[in-house]
Amino acid sequence: MSAAPARPAPGLARGARTKPSSRSAIDGTPGRSSRRRPRRGDLNVRDAGAFTKLIEIPIARGVARAAVAPAKKFFLDGKRTSEREFANTTVRAPDTDLAEYERAPMQALSGYDVGEVPFVMQAVCYYEETLDVGVLERGLRATLAKYPMLAGRLDLRVPGWQNKGVKLTNDGVPLRVIADDDLKFEDLPQDYASETRRFLDFSPWIDVMLGDAPLFTAKVTQCAGGGSVLGVCMSHAVSDGQGFIEFLVAWSKAANGEAHPWGDPVFDRTLVSQPEPGQSVEDMRAMLSAEGFDNVPSVPMLGGALMAGRTLVPDFLRFPAGNRMMVSVNTDNLRNLREASGASNDNEALSAHSWLALADLCELPRGTPLEHVTVVSGRGGRTGLPDMYFGNAAIGVCTGRVSVGDYDSLAEVRDGLRPGFTKAMMRRNKYLMLTEAAFRAGVNGFDFDIMAFMQGQMCWCNNLVEIYKKLYDLDFGGGGPSLALPPELNDIVQIQCSRPDRSTGAPAGANGVEMFINLPPATMEKMRRPEAIERLAGARGIR
Protein backbone atom coordinates (compact mmCIF):
# COMPACT_ATOMS: atom_id res chain seq x y z
CA MET A 1 0.00 0.00 0.00
CA SER A 2 1.22 3.47 -0.78
CA ALA A 3 1.59 5.57 2.35
CA ALA A 4 0.91 8.80 0.48
CA PRO A 5 2.05 10.75 -2.52
CA ALA A 6 3.79 13.02 -0.06
CA ARG A 7 5.50 10.32 2.05
CA PRO A 8 3.86 11.45 5.29
CA ALA A 9 5.82 11.22 8.49
CA PRO A 10 4.78 11.38 12.12
CA GLY A 11 4.80 13.77 15.01
CA LEU A 12 3.31 17.09 15.85
CA ALA A 13 4.74 18.61 12.66
CA ARG A 14 4.72 22.22 11.58
CA GLY A 15 4.55 23.44 8.03
CA ALA A 16 4.11 26.11 5.46
CA ARG A 17 1.39 27.89 3.60
CA THR A 18 -0.17 26.56 0.45
CA LYS A 19 -1.69 29.99 -0.29
CA PRO A 20 -4.86 30.67 -0.13
CA SER A 21 -6.16 27.25 -1.26
CA SER A 22 -9.31 25.29 -0.94
CA ARG A 23 -10.70 24.54 -4.37
CA SER A 24 -7.34 25.27 -5.96
CA ALA A 25 -4.07 25.44 -4.10
CA ILE A 26 -2.29 26.10 -7.39
CA ASP A 27 -4.07 29.10 -8.85
CA GLY A 28 -5.17 30.64 -5.54
CA THR A 29 -8.89 30.54 -6.33
CA PRO A 30 -10.72 30.39 -3.00
CA GLY A 31 -13.22 27.66 -2.17
CA ARG A 32 -16.94 28.19 -1.78
CA SER A 33 -16.65 29.02 1.88
CA SER A 34 -12.93 29.54 2.29
CA ARG A 35 -12.22 31.73 5.29
CA ARG A 36 -9.18 33.01 7.11
CA ARG A 37 -9.06 34.50 10.56
CA PRO A 38 -7.73 38.06 10.72
CA ARG A 39 -3.96 38.25 10.36
CA ARG A 40 -2.17 38.76 13.65
CA GLY A 41 1.21 39.45 12.08
CA ASP A 42 4.01 40.00 14.57
CA LEU A 43 1.72 40.66 17.52
CA ASN A 44 3.19 39.17 20.70
CA VAL A 45 5.83 37.17 18.86
CA ARG A 46 8.02 37.29 21.92
CA ASP A 47 5.48 35.15 23.75
CA ALA A 48 6.25 32.22 21.46
CA GLY A 49 8.33 29.35 22.82
CA ALA A 50 7.65 30.40 26.41
CA PHE A 51 8.50 27.02 27.92
CA THR A 52 11.93 26.86 26.29
CA LYS A 53 12.68 30.47 27.16
CA LEU A 54 11.98 29.86 30.86
CA ILE A 55 14.85 27.38 30.98
CA GLU A 56 17.20 30.21 29.97
CA ILE A 57 16.51 31.96 33.30
CA PRO A 58 18.54 30.53 36.22
CA ILE A 59 15.94 31.40 38.83
CA ALA A 60 13.21 29.76 36.74
CA ARG A 61 15.27 26.57 36.53
CA GLY A 62 15.66 26.63 40.28
CA VAL A 63 11.95 27.14 40.85
CA ALA A 64 11.13 24.27 38.48
CA ARG A 65 13.43 21.89 40.30
CA ALA A 66 12.46 22.95 43.82
CA ALA A 67 8.72 23.48 43.45
CA VAL A 68 7.42 21.91 40.26
CA ALA A 69 9.33 18.64 40.35
CA PRO A 70 7.77 17.17 43.52
CA ALA A 71 4.24 17.98 42.34
CA LYS A 72 5.05 16.68 38.87
CA LYS A 73 6.24 13.37 40.28
CA PHE A 74 2.95 12.94 42.09
CA PHE A 75 0.61 13.99 39.31
CA LEU A 76 2.38 12.89 36.15
CA ASP A 77 4.46 9.81 36.70
CA GLY A 78 1.63 7.53 37.79
CA LYS A 79 1.65 4.89 40.47
CA ARG A 80 4.69 2.63 40.64
CA THR A 81 4.29 1.43 44.20
CA SER A 82 2.65 -1.81 43.05
CA GLU A 83 5.33 -2.65 40.47
CA ARG A 84 7.79 -5.41 41.23
CA GLU A 85 11.03 -4.21 39.71
CA PHE A 86 13.17 -7.10 38.60
CA ALA A 87 16.06 -5.07 37.18
CA ASN A 88 17.01 -1.46 36.58
CA THR A 89 19.99 -0.94 34.31
CA THR A 90 21.57 2.17 32.82
CA VAL A 91 22.81 1.41 29.31
CA ARG A 92 25.62 3.57 27.96
CA ALA A 93 27.49 3.89 24.69
CA PRO A 94 30.51 1.56 24.72
CA ASP A 95 34.12 2.71 24.79
CA THR A 96 33.03 6.19 25.86
CA ASP A 97 33.69 7.74 29.26
CA LEU A 98 31.12 9.60 31.30
CA ALA A 99 31.54 13.33 30.72
CA GLU A 100 30.76 16.13 33.13
CA TYR A 101 27.71 18.06 31.93
CA GLU A 102 29.51 21.41 31.80
CA ARG A 103 32.46 20.04 29.82
CA ALA A 104 30.74 17.52 27.57
CA PRO A 105 30.70 18.23 23.83
CA MET A 106 27.36 19.32 22.41
CA GLN A 107 25.43 17.87 19.48
CA ALA A 108 23.62 20.80 17.87
CA LEU A 109 19.86 20.82 17.42
CA SER A 110 17.89 22.73 14.81
CA GLY A 111 15.43 25.46 15.68
CA TYR A 112 12.67 23.02 14.76
CA ASP A 113 14.08 20.43 17.19
CA VAL A 114 14.09 22.96 20.03
CA GLY A 115 10.46 23.80 19.31
CA GLU A 116 9.51 20.13 19.81
CA VAL A 117 11.17 19.86 23.23
CA PRO A 118 8.00 19.34 25.32
CA PHE A 119 6.70 16.40 23.29
CA VAL A 120 7.35 12.68 23.73
CA MET A 121 6.85 9.80 21.29
CA GLN A 122 6.09 6.31 22.49
CA ALA A 123 5.27 2.80 21.30
CA VAL A 124 4.26 -0.46 22.97
CA CYS A 125 4.97 -3.91 21.48
CA TYR A 126 3.65 -7.27 22.67
CA TYR A 127 5.90 -10.34 22.31
CA GLU A 128 4.51 -13.85 22.75
CA GLU A 129 8.03 -15.16 23.28
CA THR A 130 9.50 -13.78 26.50
CA LEU A 131 12.14 -11.18 25.70
CA ASP A 132 15.74 -11.87 26.69
CA VAL A 133 16.70 -8.69 28.52
CA GLY A 134 20.40 -9.45 28.13
CA VAL A 135 19.99 -9.45 24.35
CA LEU A 136 18.05 -6.18 24.54
CA GLU A 137 20.76 -4.58 26.65
CA ARG A 138 23.64 -5.67 24.43
CA GLY A 139 21.82 -4.51 21.32
CA LEU A 140 20.96 -1.16 22.90
CA ARG A 141 24.55 -0.60 23.97
CA ALA A 142 25.81 -1.25 20.45
CA THR A 143 23.16 1.05 18.97
CA LEU A 144 24.02 3.90 21.34
CA ALA A 145 27.52 3.83 19.87
CA LYS A 146 25.93 5.20 16.70
CA TYR A 147 23.29 7.31 18.49
CA PRO A 148 25.36 8.90 21.30
CA MET A 149 22.97 11.83 21.70
CA LEU A 150 20.33 9.45 23.11
CA ALA A 151 22.68 8.70 25.99
CA GLY A 152 23.12 12.44 26.62
CA ARG A 153 21.05 15.20 28.16
CA LEU A 154 19.46 18.38 26.78
CA ASP A 155 21.06 21.78 27.37
CA LEU A 156 18.68 24.69 26.76
CA ARG A 157 20.24 27.20 29.15
CA VAL A 158 21.90 29.64 26.75
CA PRO A 159 19.56 31.98 24.80
CA GLY A 160 19.44 31.52 21.04
CA TRP A 161 18.43 28.41 19.13
CA GLN A 162 22.00 27.97 17.88
CA ASN A 163 23.22 27.54 21.47
CA LYS A 164 20.90 24.67 22.35
CA GLY A 165 21.63 21.00 21.89
CA VAL A 166 22.34 17.69 23.53
CA LYS A 167 25.31 17.34 25.85
CA LEU A 168 27.07 14.08 24.98
CA THR A 169 27.55 13.08 28.62
CA ASN A 170 26.92 9.35 28.15
CA ASP A 171 24.71 9.42 31.23
CA GLY A 172 22.89 6.62 29.51
CA VAL A 173 19.47 5.17 28.85
CA PRO A 174 17.40 3.49 31.58
CA LEU A 175 16.24 -0.06 30.88
CA ARG A 176 13.81 -1.23 33.55
CA VAL A 177 12.38 -4.72 33.88
CA ILE A 178 9.11 -5.35 35.71
CA ALA A 179 7.78 -8.78 36.65
CA ASP A 180 3.98 -8.79 36.78
CA ASP A 181 2.76 -12.03 38.34
CA ASP A 182 -0.89 -11.07 37.83
CA LEU A 183 -0.78 -10.14 34.16
CA LYS A 184 -1.25 -12.83 31.54
CA PHE A 185 -0.26 -12.22 27.95
CA GLU A 186 -3.73 -12.99 26.62
CA ASP A 187 -5.21 -10.32 28.91
CA LEU A 188 -3.12 -7.45 27.53
CA PRO A 189 -5.21 -4.46 26.35
CA GLN A 190 -5.60 -4.23 22.59
CA ASP A 191 -5.34 -0.44 22.23
CA TYR A 192 -4.00 2.57 24.07
CA ALA A 193 -6.02 3.41 27.14
CA SER A 194 -5.10 4.62 30.59
CA GLU A 195 -4.03 1.11 31.63
CA THR A 196 -1.55 0.70 28.77
CA ARG A 197 0.51 3.71 29.86
CA ARG A 198 1.78 1.55 32.71
CA PHE A 199 4.04 -0.15 30.15
CA LEU A 200 5.93 3.11 29.53
CA ASP A 201 8.50 4.99 31.58
CA PHE A 202 7.98 8.63 30.66
CA SER A 203 10.66 11.21 31.21
CA PRO A 204 8.37 14.13 32.12
CA TRP A 205 8.93 17.02 29.77
CA ILE A 206 9.94 19.41 32.56
CA ASP A 207 12.79 17.12 33.56
CA VAL A 208 13.86 16.69 29.94
CA MET A 209 13.91 20.45 29.38
CA LEU A 210 16.02 20.95 32.50
CA GLY A 211 18.56 18.40 31.30
CA ASP A 212 17.76 16.18 34.28
CA ALA A 213 16.19 13.24 32.44
CA PRO A 214 17.07 10.78 29.67
CA LEU A 215 15.93 11.37 26.11
CA PHE A 216 15.03 7.71 25.59
CA THR A 217 13.63 5.15 28.01
CA ALA A 218 12.86 1.45 27.67
CA LYS A 219 10.72 -0.69 29.93
CA VAL A 220 10.12 -4.44 29.74
CA THR A 221 7.14 -5.98 31.53
CA GLN A 222 7.41 -9.74 31.88
CA CYS A 223 3.99 -11.41 31.95
CA ALA A 224 2.93 -14.30 34.15
CA GLY A 225 3.26 -17.55 32.23
CA GLY A 226 5.44 -16.06 29.50
CA GLY A 227 5.37 -13.20 27.06
CA SER A 228 6.65 -9.64 27.34
CA VAL A 229 5.69 -6.05 26.70
CA LEU A 230 8.31 -3.59 25.45
CA GLY A 231 7.45 0.07 26.00
CA VAL A 232 9.72 2.81 24.64
CA CYS A 233 9.65 6.61 24.82
CA MET A 234 11.77 9.18 22.98
CA SER A 235 11.89 12.94 23.28
CA HIS A 236 10.60 14.73 20.18
CA ALA A 237 13.46 17.21 20.64
CA VAL A 238 15.94 14.83 19.03
CA SER A 239 13.84 13.47 16.16
CA ASP A 240 10.43 12.94 14.65
CA GLY A 241 8.68 9.59 14.39
CA GLN A 242 10.58 8.34 11.36
CA GLY A 243 13.91 8.81 13.11
CA PHE A 244 12.39 7.18 16.20
CA ILE A 245 11.36 4.09 14.25
CA GLU A 246 14.67 3.77 12.38
CA PHE A 247 16.47 3.87 15.74
CA LEU A 248 14.28 1.01 16.97
CA VAL A 249 15.04 -0.91 13.77
CA ALA A 250 18.77 -0.31 14.32
CA TRP A 251 18.38 -1.59 17.91
CA SER A 252 16.65 -4.80 16.85
CA LYS A 253 19.20 -5.38 14.10
CA ALA A 254 22.08 -4.84 16.53
CA ALA A 255 20.51 -7.34 18.93
CA ASN A 256 20.93 -9.91 16.14
CA GLY A 257 24.44 -8.81 15.24
CA GLU A 258 23.33 -6.95 12.12
CA ALA A 259 23.53 -3.38 10.84
CA HIS A 260 20.63 -1.20 9.79
CA PRO A 261 20.03 -1.89 6.07
CA TRP A 262 20.00 1.84 5.31
CA GLY A 263 23.30 2.55 7.05
CA ASP A 264 24.20 4.86 9.92
CA PRO A 265 22.13 7.78 11.23
CA VAL A 266 22.75 11.30 9.93
CA PHE A 267 22.75 14.12 12.51
CA ASP A 268 23.96 17.10 10.45
CA ARG A 269 21.39 19.88 11.02
CA THR A 270 22.95 22.02 8.30
CA LEU A 271 21.33 19.67 5.78
CA VAL A 272 17.93 21.10 6.72
CA SER A 273 16.81 23.90 4.41
CA GLN A 274 17.99 27.12 6.08
CA PRO A 275 16.86 30.74 6.08
CA GLU A 276 19.22 33.07 4.22
CA PRO A 277 22.63 33.42 5.94
CA GLY A 278 22.77 36.48 8.13
CA GLN A 279 19.00 36.89 8.18
CA SER A 280 18.02 38.63 11.41
CA VAL A 281 15.11 37.63 13.62
CA GLU A 282 13.24 40.69 12.36
CA ASP A 283 13.87 39.65 8.75
CA MET A 284 12.63 36.13 9.45
CA ARG A 285 9.50 37.48 11.12
CA ALA A 286 8.82 39.71 8.13
CA MET A 287 9.31 36.77 5.76
CA LEU A 288 6.99 34.57 7.84
CA SER A 289 4.36 37.28 8.00
CA ALA A 290 4.47 37.63 4.22
CA GLU A 291 3.92 33.85 3.95
CA GLY A 292 0.91 34.07 6.26
CA PHE A 293 2.46 32.45 9.33
CA ASP A 294 0.22 34.26 11.80
CA ASN A 295 1.59 34.25 15.34
CA VAL A 296 -0.56 33.10 18.25
CA PRO A 297 0.61 34.00 21.78
CA SER A 298 1.45 30.97 23.90
CA VAL A 299 -0.97 31.67 26.75
CA PRO A 300 -4.22 31.77 24.73
CA MET A 301 -2.99 28.85 22.61
CA LEU A 302 -2.46 26.69 25.68
CA GLY A 303 -5.63 28.00 27.26
CA GLY A 304 -7.63 26.96 24.21
CA ALA A 305 -6.04 23.52 24.34
CA LEU A 306 -6.97 23.02 27.99
CA MET A 307 -10.51 24.28 27.39
CA ALA A 308 -10.89 21.68 24.63
CA GLY A 309 -9.98 18.91 27.05
CA ARG A 310 -6.24 18.50 26.54
CA THR A 311 -4.28 17.73 29.69
CA LEU A 312 -0.73 18.31 30.89
CA VAL A 313 0.61 14.77 30.98
CA PRO A 314 4.21 13.49 30.96
CA ASP A 315 4.24 13.78 27.17
CA PHE A 316 2.87 17.35 27.37
CA LEU A 317 -0.46 18.43 25.89
CA ARG A 318 -2.61 15.47 24.93
CA PHE A 319 -6.23 14.57 25.05
CA PRO A 320 -6.69 12.13 27.97
CA ALA A 321 -5.27 8.63 27.64
CA GLY A 322 -7.88 6.35 26.12
CA ASN A 323 -9.68 9.28 24.48
CA ARG A 324 -8.83 8.23 20.95
CA MET A 325 -10.78 5.53 19.14
CA MET A 326 -9.59 2.95 16.64
CA VAL A 327 -11.76 2.29 13.58
CA SER A 328 -10.91 -0.52 11.18
CA VAL A 329 -11.26 0.26 7.47
CA ASN A 330 -11.02 -3.18 5.92
CA THR A 331 -9.81 -3.97 2.42
CA ASP A 332 -13.29 -4.05 0.89
CA ASN A 333 -14.31 -0.70 2.40
CA LEU A 334 -11.00 0.86 1.40
CA ARG A 335 -11.53 -0.29 -2.18
CA ASN A 336 -15.04 1.22 -2.13
CA LEU A 337 -13.63 4.54 -0.89
CA ARG A 338 -11.10 4.62 -3.73
CA GLU A 339 -13.78 3.88 -6.30
CA ALA A 340 -16.19 6.49 -4.92
CA SER A 341 -13.52 9.18 -4.72
CA GLY A 342 -11.67 8.34 -7.93
CA ALA A 343 -8.46 8.58 -5.91
CA SER A 344 -5.17 7.42 -7.39
CA ASN A 345 -3.94 5.88 -4.12
CA ASP A 346 -5.16 4.85 -0.67
CA ASN A 347 -3.88 7.96 1.08
CA GLU A 348 -5.78 10.28 -1.25
CA ALA A 349 -8.98 8.27 -0.70
CA LEU A 350 -8.55 8.17 3.08
CA SER A 351 -7.79 11.89 3.25
CA ALA A 352 -10.98 12.72 1.38
CA HIS A 353 -12.97 10.21 3.43
CA SER A 354 -11.73 11.43 6.81
CA TRP A 355 -12.53 15.09 6.01
CA LEU A 356 -16.03 14.38 4.70
CA ALA A 357 -16.83 11.99 7.56
CA LEU A 358 -15.73 14.50 10.22
CA ALA A 359 -17.61 17.30 8.46
CA ASP A 360 -20.73 15.13 8.67
CA LEU A 361 -20.28 13.74 12.18
CA CYS A 362 -18.94 16.69 14.21
CA GLU A 363 -22.31 18.45 13.84
CA LEU A 364 -20.67 21.82 13.21
CA PRO A 365 -22.76 24.56 11.58
CA ARG A 366 -22.45 24.82 7.83
CA GLY A 367 -19.71 27.30 6.94
CA THR A 368 -17.58 26.49 10.02
CA PRO A 369 -13.88 26.36 9.05
CA LEU A 370 -12.56 22.79 9.02
CA GLU A 371 -9.10 22.82 7.49
CA HIS A 372 -7.56 19.68 6.06
CA VAL A 373 -3.89 19.28 6.97
CA THR A 374 -1.54 16.54 5.90
CA VAL A 375 1.95 15.69 7.11
CA VAL A 376 4.78 15.57 4.60
CA SER A 377 8.26 14.15 5.10
CA GLY A 378 11.33 16.18 4.21
CA ARG A 379 13.28 12.95 3.67
CA GLY A 380 13.87 10.91 0.57
CA GLY A 381 13.73 11.53 -3.13
CA ARG A 382 16.18 13.46 -5.24
CA THR A 383 15.99 16.69 -3.24
CA GLY A 384 15.04 15.47 0.23
CA LEU A 385 17.05 14.78 3.34
CA PRO A 386 18.74 11.38 3.75
CA ASP A 387 16.37 8.59 4.77
CA MET A 388 18.47 8.09 7.91
CA TYR A 389 18.35 11.76 8.93
CA PHE A 390 17.81 11.73 12.71
CA GLY A 391 15.98 14.92 13.56
CA ASN A 392 12.67 16.67 12.98
CA ALA A 393 11.82 16.80 9.29
CA ALA A 394 8.04 16.31 9.12
CA ILE A 395 5.96 19.31 8.13
CA GLY A 396 2.26 19.94 8.47
CA VAL A 397 0.75 21.56 5.38
CA CYS A 398 -2.78 22.87 4.97
CA THR A 399 -3.93 21.00 1.88
CA GLY A 400 -7.43 22.41 2.05
CA ARG A 401 -8.46 25.69 3.70
CA VAL A 402 -12.10 24.69 3.61
CA SER A 403 -15.30 24.79 5.65
CA VAL A 404 -18.16 22.48 6.50
CA GLY A 405 -20.47 22.30 3.49
CA ASP A 406 -17.85 23.16 0.87
CA TYR A 407 -17.92 19.62 -0.51
CA ASP A 408 -20.74 17.10 -0.77
CA SER A 409 -18.99 14.00 -2.15
CA LEU A 410 -15.70 12.17 -1.90
CA ALA A 411 -14.88 13.05 -5.50
CA GLU A 412 -15.34 16.76 -4.75
CA VAL A 413 -13.10 16.53 -1.68
CA ARG A 414 -10.45 14.68 -3.70
CA ASP A 415 -10.51 17.37 -6.39
CA GLY A 416 -10.29 20.07 -3.74
CA LEU A 417 -7.34 18.54 -1.89
CA ARG A 418 -5.30 17.23 -4.81
CA PRO A 419 -3.65 20.58 -5.73
CA GLY A 420 -2.65 21.05 -2.10
CA PHE A 421 -1.00 17.63 -1.99
CA THR A 422 0.90 18.36 -5.19
CA LYS A 423 2.10 21.75 -4.07
CA ALA A 424 3.08 20.47 -0.63
CA MET A 425 5.36 17.84 -2.08
CA MET A 426 6.83 20.08 -4.78
CA ARG A 427 7.76 22.78 -2.26
CA ARG A 428 8.58 20.70 0.80
CA ASN A 429 12.11 22.09 1.13
CA LYS A 430 10.73 25.62 1.26
CA TYR A 431 8.16 24.54 3.82
CA LEU A 432 10.87 22.99 5.96
CA MET A 433 12.87 26.22 5.73
CA LEU A 434 9.85 28.29 6.81
CA THR A 435 9.24 25.91 9.69
CA GLU A 436 12.85 26.25 10.80
CA ALA A 437 12.59 30.04 10.54
CA ALA A 438 9.40 30.09 12.60
CA PHE A 439 11.05 28.30 15.49
CA ARG A 440 14.24 30.34 15.24
CA ALA A 441 12.25 33.57 15.30
CA GLY A 442 10.03 32.45 18.19
CA VAL A 443 6.81 32.63 16.19
CA ASN A 444 3.83 30.39 17.03
CA GLY A 445 2.70 30.66 13.44
CA PHE A 446 2.14 27.79 11.07
CA ASP A 447 0.51 27.09 7.74
CA PHE A 448 -2.55 25.80 9.54
CA ASP A 449 -4.69 27.41 12.24
CA ILE A 450 -2.89 26.35 15.43
CA MET A 451 -5.82 27.41 17.62
CA ALA A 452 -8.17 25.18 15.62
CA PHE A 453 -5.67 22.33 15.91
CA MET A 454 -5.34 22.71 19.67
CA GLN A 455 -9.12 22.81 19.99
CA GLY A 456 -9.53 19.75 17.77
CA GLN A 457 -11.55 21.53 15.09
CA MET A 458 -9.53 20.38 12.11
CA CYS A 459 -8.93 17.29 9.98
CA TRP A 460 -5.22 16.80 10.70
CA CYS A 461 -4.51 13.60 8.77
CA ASN A 462 -1.24 11.74 9.31
CA ASN A 463 -0.70 8.57 7.29
CA LEU A 464 1.91 6.45 9.05
CA VAL A 465 1.18 3.11 7.39
CA GLU A 466 4.60 2.41 5.90
CA ILE A 467 6.64 3.90 8.73
CA TYR A 468 4.94 2.22 11.66
CA LYS A 469 4.53 -1.12 9.89
CA LYS A 470 8.23 -1.44 10.74
CA LEU A 471 7.28 -1.93 14.39
CA TYR A 472 6.30 -5.45 13.40
CA ASP A 473 9.88 -6.06 12.20
CA LEU A 474 11.36 -5.43 15.66
CA ASP A 475 12.73 -8.92 16.25
CA PHE A 476 15.06 -9.22 19.24
CA GLY A 477 15.71 -12.91 18.70
CA GLY A 478 12.33 -14.53 19.35
CA GLY A 479 10.28 -13.13 16.51
CA GLY A 480 8.49 -9.84 15.93
CA PRO A 481 5.64 -8.52 18.07
CA SER A 482 2.17 -9.98 17.77
CA LEU A 483 0.77 -6.48 18.26
CA ALA A 484 2.43 -3.07 18.06
CA LEU A 485 0.40 -0.24 19.51
CA PRO A 486 1.26 2.97 17.62
CA PRO A 487 2.19 6.20 19.35
CA GLU A 488 -0.56 8.22 20.96
CA LEU A 489 0.34 11.36 19.06
CA ASN A 490 -1.56 14.63 18.77
CA ASP A 491 -2.85 13.67 15.33
CA ILE A 492 -6.60 14.11 14.96
CA VAL A 493 -6.71 11.36 12.31
CA GLN A 494 -3.81 8.92 12.45
CA ILE A 495 -3.72 6.13 9.86
CA GLN A 496 -1.89 2.89 10.63
CA CYS A 497 -1.59 -0.49 8.96
CA SER A 498 -4.06 -3.17 10.00
CA ARG A 499 -2.85 -5.40 12.81
CA PRO A 500 -1.99 -9.07 12.23
CA ASP A 501 -4.88 -11.53 12.32
CA ARG A 502 -3.88 -14.43 14.54
CA SER A 503 -6.87 -16.51 13.45
CA THR A 504 -5.93 -16.45 9.76
CA GLY A 505 -2.22 -15.78 9.97
CA ALA A 506 -2.56 -12.59 7.89
CA PRO A 507 0.39 -10.23 8.51
CA ALA A 508 0.21 -6.58 9.47
CA GLY A 509 -1.20 -4.45 6.67
CA ALA A 510 -3.02 -7.29 4.91
CA ASN A 511 -6.55 -6.11 5.73
CA GLY A 512 -6.79 -2.40 5.08
CA VAL A 513 -5.92 0.19 7.69
CA GLU A 514 -6.76 1.32 11.19
CA MET A 515 -7.81 4.94 11.66
CA PHE A 516 -7.29 6.44 15.10
CA ILE A 517 -9.65 9.36 15.73
CA ASN A 518 -8.60 11.77 18.51
CA LEU A 519 -10.94 14.75 18.94
CA PRO A 520 -12.01 16.65 22.06
CA PRO A 521 -13.71 14.35 24.61
CA ALA A 522 -17.11 15.98 24.05
CA THR A 523 -16.85 15.40 20.30
CA MET A 524 -15.64 11.84 20.79
CA GLU A 525 -19.00 11.00 22.37
CA LYS A 526 -20.54 11.59 18.94
CA MET A 527 -17.84 9.52 17.23
CA ARG A 528 -18.53 6.50 19.44
CA ARG A 529 -22.12 6.08 18.29
CA PRO A 530 -22.54 2.82 16.32
CA GLU A 531 -23.68 4.62 13.18
CA ALA A 532 -20.71 7.04 13.42
CA ILE A 533 -18.26 4.15 13.72
CA GLU A 534 -19.77 2.53 10.62
CA ARG A 535 -19.48 5.86 8.79
CA LEU A 536 -15.82 6.26 9.73
CA ALA A 537 -15.14 2.64 8.77
CA GLY A 538 -16.46 3.31 5.26
CA ALA A 539 -19.34 0.88 5.77
CA ARG A 540 -22.17 3.38 5.29
CA GLY A 541 -22.96 6.87 4.04
CA ILE A 542 -20.37 6.82 1.25
CA ARG A 543 -21.17 9.32 -1.47
Describe the function of each predicted region.
Residues 2-3, 14-17, 23, 27, ...:
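Non-catalytic N-terminal regions of enzymes
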Residues 6-7:
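Short, low-complexity disordered leader/linker segments with a strong preference
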Residues 119, 123, 300-307:
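A compositional signature for long Ser/Thr(±Pro)-rich, low-complexity
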Residues 291-302:
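Intrinsically disordered, low-complexity regulatory tails flanking kinase catalytic domains
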Residues 305-316:
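Acyltransferase donor/substrate-recognition loop-hinge adjacent to the catalytic core
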Residues 326, 335-336, 347, 389-473:
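Helical lid/core segments from catalytic subdomains that handle acyl or acyl-like groups
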